[in-house]
């Protein structure tokens, strides 16, 4: 459900921003892409990134929880920036925390919680955000999309 | 029994309704087809709290049951239909609409206010105080009145006087006897009461018998007294006692007492065994009981009689505790000590604090027979327990009424009460009943209340009930869980104390030291903003500093309120609502440049909506350059100080309300608190700034400022309560400093002052003791803390736009400069709005 809602919006966005879109569309759809550096991230919080994927553009929320994975990775998470409950692109601006053992982000609009691990909404089992693979390469942040 | 019997109840007041509840709850409707006649328009309502009608409650919230209760229970309720005759021969009651047969009949007609037979007592604007309709009439009459008089200085008279005062009338009380509340207090107590009430600006005239009421010269009426003295007034409320509504019973020949009242026995049966009487209309053992608790007990006895049970009515305790015009008055048992010839009395009078307490004890000094309290009811609950449970008094009974500091005065803890101790007298709930519900599975106060109804009557036992329930739960090893969330086993107040005492300055430190070990110690959207607010209240470091930024709600993070489409609003501070034309022009120009929707708020400033995240720094840069600063519309903090135009322009104003509002707004701006705080300042009693609906309301007087606290608008409006009078500017700042800091210190997260105040044990009196009398000895500290916050104020936006590190978050995407393309606007009435 989330996917189609997002897709539809992006179609409108494409029309609005066709110039910008073309610029990006000319890029190669590689599996892993660099989005930013560590300095762009905010520890224990999120930032949003614009991603071109094979399925079209996507807005991705990237969260950085230093120390959470105790050195085994697991300290970067990437999921939909789009909040399916409010239909606004705001997830990266939510508060990060842990509930019942899982790291979560709370939507800043209506406060539902989404598991960072897999995007699952804790309040509504039918709702799940998309997730992307994300990792550090040195100081760079790379997302597979 | 094949057919149902017809049971008719006349009167849908408090007691009649209680009987219906008994019948419904105990399955008696299989046997009886019940019809209730009520003369009033409204279904049964809480007459005890009638006066709250003037402080914002309406008929629906005062009602004793949901609107559909009667219909769904299968009881026929006929409101606005008075019974005009009882025909005992044919066993029928008669109304204008028809005749209705009965097998059993219950009279629950209550009483009517006695209006003394004074010529002129039926003039327009001569009213009584008993029903919702009476209150509507008073309110209507008060519209174009400036003065009001209450005839009768008893309990209800003083309550009516308070109501008139609340309607902004200059109020006087005229009493026939030589003291106020002659039934409840003695001469010394009455004198103290008079002083206190006069200090509130209510005139008290004693030993005045009104001879006649005629046209006045300056006002609508003139009251002429026995010595030809006169008093002019626009409105008169008679409250000279109540009389049982026994006319129906008289007309059909039931036995009536000499001074009125339908005679009943222990089963509440009248002289006709088919007919019962309960509540204020019933006369038992030569007594009328003018309180709701005995009425409820009669209803229970009547239910028992109707169902062949054996519960009887055996008289009732008339002990009462009240707050009249803000003055505590308590009376227990034989308060005058004139029913027990051998009784001995202890008296304590504090002429400075204006408190009076009297104990009436048995000749051996072991039992409490009665007590009287004026000015301070804090020992009432304890004394009542000694009295009603016959608990042996301590060796020095006087210690019970001496001030706390002079030693002893042990309050009876909940553990010391016997099982039979009555906790809620309205619903006759004992400590034993409470223990039983807990043993049967109730796990909190709400559960106990639902199961026993305790504390749902007059509410006088709320604090006692809570302490008994908490005590019993703890005794059973139930941890009363007050944790803020799964990360901390502490309340907000405890976290606040920890932060202050240990000087902890970051969330990370706090959760490391005091967080629950079995979580990831990341916190959550409950505890993080709460701790952020505590840290800001204590240390006032910018909320956008690196250590604090992940704690903030998005609104605080971006120092703007997120709207439903992900854009933000911009609200610069306009202290007191005063703004220069030049600044107005800047607001207009900025709004135009960034395509912002503009609206004037109820807080007397201008809200610009639809700002994109990446535009916020530029918008604020321009605003700050023009001399604006952040308005904290996003924060749990001071919002606005609303003001009327005041004495500088207004012909009625007595003080400069705008000047004061600006002073206050600038003093408290930036204070982070458990929830938002709103102020209002009015320049005279006309109250154009609606200050009494604010957390802090200030109304100018000839001599300074009256301070009101803990008001609220919104879903559950609450009038602010008068806290201190005639303060000068300095006193006003100091009192507000203390009040706000005490609130910041002790409230729960997201608890507005109104709710905080309602949950505060000891209520307004306690608050006054702490803030005005420094009973906790913390006022210096509270003032110091507030001064620190005032001294360290800096505009968060000014701080942020000068720090590139902080500005880095103000873009839609880390890797792309484009704005979020899915924000789409459309136009309406010449401005943009979300599509
Ligand atoms: C302002 C105020 C404050 C009070 N404060 C307190 C307090 O703090 N504590 C306390 O214990 N008590 C207090 N009381 C007293 C308490 O309200 C009464 O004791 C209680 O309401 C009595 O209940 P009742 O059912 O007997 O009478 P009511 O509640 O008066 O009900 C009687 C009903 O019968 C109706 N009726 C009468 N005749 C007929 C008829 N012929 N046909 C149909 N209907 C009829 C009346 O209209 C009325 O609605 C207060 C009362 C007032 C007015
Ligand atoms: C649960 C109830 C309420 C919520 C959640 C709420 C929320 C808000 C929010 C978010 C704003 C800021 C708007 C913005 O700038 O984006 C606001 C402003 C305002 N609200 Fe409320 N509000 C509530 C109840 C009330 C009530 C009951 C009143 C009045 C009695 C009120 C009066 C105002 C005023 C006057 C403003 C503008 C204040 C200013 O100028 O900063 N609000 N409210
Ligand atoms: S409250 Fe008084 S001073 Fe203020 S505007 Fe109204 S009338 Fe004038």
Feature map (PLM): residue ranges:
Chain A
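Active-site loop/oxyanion-hole signature of alpha/beta-hydrolase fold enzymes
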Residues: 125
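Short cysteine clusters
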Residues: 83, 107-110
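N-terminal pre-ligand scaffold of iron-sulfur
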Residues: 2-102, 115-116, 128-145
């Amino acid at each position: 459900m989330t996917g189609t809602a997002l897709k539809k919006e992006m179609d409108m966005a494409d029309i609005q921003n066709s110039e910008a879109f073309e610029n990006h569309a000319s890029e190669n759809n590689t599996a892993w892409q660099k989005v930013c550096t560590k300095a762009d991230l905010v520890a224990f919080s999120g930032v949003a990134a614009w991603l071109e994927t094979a399925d079209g553009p996507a807005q991705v929320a990237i969260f950085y929880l230093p120390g959470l994975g105790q050195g085994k990775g697991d300290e970067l998470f990437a999921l939909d920036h789009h909040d399916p409950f409010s239909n606004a692109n705001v997830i990266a601006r939510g508060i990060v925390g842990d509930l019942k053992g899982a790291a979560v982000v709370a939507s800043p609009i209506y406060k539902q919680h989404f598991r960072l691990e897999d995007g699952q909404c804790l309040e509504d089992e039918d709702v799940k955000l998309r997730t992307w693979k994300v990792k550090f390469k040195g100081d760079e942040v790379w997302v597979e999309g | 029994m094949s057919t149902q019997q017809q049971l008719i109840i006349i009167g849908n007041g408090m007691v009649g309704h209680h009987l219906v509840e008994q019948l419904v709850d105990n399955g008696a409707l299989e046997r009886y087809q019940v019809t209730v006649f009520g003369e009033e328009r409204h279904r049964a309502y809480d007459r005890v709290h009638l006066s709250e009608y003037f402080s914002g409650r309406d008929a629906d919230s005062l009602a004793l049951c949901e609107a559909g209760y009667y219909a769904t229970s299968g009881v026929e309720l006929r409101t606005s239909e008075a019974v005009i005759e009882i025909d005992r021969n044919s066993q029928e009651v008669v109304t204008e609409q028809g005749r209705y047969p009965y097998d059993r009949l219950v009279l629950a007609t209550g009483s009517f206010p006695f209006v003394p037979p004074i010529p002129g007592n039926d003039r327009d604007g001569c009213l009584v105080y008993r029903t919702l309709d009476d209150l509507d009439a008073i309110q209507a009459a008060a519209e174009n009145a400036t003065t009001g008089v209450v005839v009768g200085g008893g309990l209800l008279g003083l309550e009516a006087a308070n109501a008139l005062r609340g309607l902004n009338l200059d109020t006087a009380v005229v009493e026939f006897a030589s003291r106020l509340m002659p039934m409840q207090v003695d001469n010394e107590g009455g004198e103290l009461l008079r002083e206190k009430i006069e200090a509130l600006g209510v005139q008290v005239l004693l030993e005045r018998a009104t001879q006649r009421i005629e046209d006045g010269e300056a006002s609508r009426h003139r009251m002429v007294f026995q010595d030809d003295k006169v008093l002019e007034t626009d409105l008169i409320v008679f409250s000279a006692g109540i009389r049982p509504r026994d006319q129906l019973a008289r007309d059909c020949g039931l036995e009536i007492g000499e001074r009125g009242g339908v005679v009943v026995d222990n089963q509440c049966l009248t002289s006709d065994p088919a007919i019962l009487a309960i509540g204020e209309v019933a006369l038992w053992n030569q007594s009328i009981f003018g309180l709701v608790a005995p009425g409820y007990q009669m209803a229970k006895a009547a239910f028992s009689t109707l169902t062949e049970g054996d519960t009887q009515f055996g008289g009732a305790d008339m002990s009462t505790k009240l707050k009249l015009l803000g003055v505590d008055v308590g009376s227990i048992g034989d308060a005058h000590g004139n029913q027990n010839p051998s009784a001995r009395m202890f008296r304590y009078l504090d002429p400075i604090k204006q408190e009076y307490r009297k104990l009436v004890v048995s000749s051996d000094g072991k039992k409490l027979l009665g007590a009287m309290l004026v000015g301070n009811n804090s020992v009432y609950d304890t004394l009542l327990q000694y009295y009603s449970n016959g608990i042996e008094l301590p060796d020095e009974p006087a210690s019970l009424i001496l001030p706390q500091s002079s030693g002893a005065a042990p309050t009876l803890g909940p553990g010391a009460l016997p099982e039979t101790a009555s906790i809620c007298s309205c619903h006759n709930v004992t400590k034993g009943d409470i223990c039983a519900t807990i043993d049967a599975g109730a796990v909190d106060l709400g559960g106990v209340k639902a199961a026993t109804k305790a504390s749902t009557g007059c509410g006088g036992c709320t604090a006692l009930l809570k302490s008994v329930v908490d005590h019993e739960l703890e005794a059973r090893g139930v941890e009363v869980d007050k944790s803020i969330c799964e990360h901390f086993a502490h309340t907000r107040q405890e976290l606040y104390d920890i932060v202050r005492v240990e000087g902890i300055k970051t969330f990370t430190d706090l959760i490391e030291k005091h967080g629950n070990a079995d979580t990831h110690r990341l916190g959550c959207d409950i505890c993080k903003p709460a701790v952020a607010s505590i840290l800001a209240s204590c240390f006032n470091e910018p909320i956008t500093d690196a250590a604090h930024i992940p704690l903030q709600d998005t609104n605080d993070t971006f120092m703007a309120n997120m709207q439903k489409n992900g854009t933000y609003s911009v609200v610069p501070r306009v202290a007191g609502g005063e703004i220069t034309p030049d600044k107005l022009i800047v607001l207009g120009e900025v709004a135009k440049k960034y395509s912002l929707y503009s609206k004037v708020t109820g807080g007397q400033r201008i809200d610009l909506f639809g700002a994109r995240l990446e535009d916020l720094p530029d918008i604020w840069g321009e605003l700050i350059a023009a001399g604006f600063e952040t308005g904290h519309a996003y924060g749990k903090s001071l919002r606005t100080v609303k003001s009327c135009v005041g004495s500088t322009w207004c012909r009625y104003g007595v003080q400069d309300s705008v000047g004061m509002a600006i002073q206050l707004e600038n003093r408290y701006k930036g204070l982070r608190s458990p929830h938002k705080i709103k102020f209002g300042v009015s320049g005279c009693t006309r109250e154009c700034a609606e200050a009494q609906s604010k957390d802090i309301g200030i109304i100018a007087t000839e001599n300074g400022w009256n301070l009101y606290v803990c008001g609220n608008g919104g879903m559950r409006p609450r009038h602010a309560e008068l806290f201190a009078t005639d303060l000068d500017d300095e006193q006003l700042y100091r009192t507000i400093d203390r009040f706000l800091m005490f609130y910041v210190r002790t409230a729960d997260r997201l608890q507005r002052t109104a709710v905080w105040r309602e949950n505060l044990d000891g209520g307004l009196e306690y608050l006054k003791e702490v803030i005005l009398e420094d009973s906790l000895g913390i006022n210096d500290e509270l003032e110091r803390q507030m001064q620190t916050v005032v001294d360290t104020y800096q505009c968060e936006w000014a701080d942020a736009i000068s720090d590139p590190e902080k500005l880095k978050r103000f873009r839609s995407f880390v890797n792309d400069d484009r704005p979020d393309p899915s924000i789409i606007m459309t136009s309406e009435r010449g401005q943009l709005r979300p599509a």
